[in-house]
């Protein structure tokens, strides 16, 4: 996996959850914060990552 932030600049509006990758193979955090597992160093710590399967609907927000 790689950071999709470049592909989806408005990922926070396109995805249902904001996925924060603190490190590789991190475990999911409680609450609405979901951590994407297997993120590479390309994301950088604290970078927002998201897979298309985590997106709520199409790549473009319906609103």
UniProtKB/Swiss-Prot annotation:
TM region positions: none
Subcellular compartments: Secreted
Record flagged with keyword Disulfide bond: yes
Gene Ontology molecular function: any one: toxin activity
Alphabetized UniProt keyword annotations: Disulfide bond, Neurotoxin, Postsynaptic neurotoxin, Secreted, Toxin
GO cellular component, one term: extracellular region
Family as reported in the entry's similarity comment: Belongs to the three-finger toxin family. Short-chain subfamily. Orphan group XVIII sub-subfamily.
Miscellaneous comment as given in the Swiss-Prot or TrEMBL entry: In contrast to other snake toxins the action of this toxin is reversible. Unusual amino acid sequence distinctly different from other short-chain type toxins.
Function: Blocks both the muscle-twitch response to nerve stimulation and the response to exogenous acetylcholine.
Entry protein name: Short neurotoxin 2
């Amino acid at each position: 996996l790689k950071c999709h932030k470049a592909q989806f600049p408005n990922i926070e509006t396109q995805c249902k959850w904001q996925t924060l990758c603190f490190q590789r193979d991190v475990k999911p955090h409680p609450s609405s914060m979901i951590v994407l597992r297997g993120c590479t160093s390309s994301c950088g710590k604290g970078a927002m990552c998201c897979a298309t399967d985590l997106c709520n609907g199409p790549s473009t927000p319906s609103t």
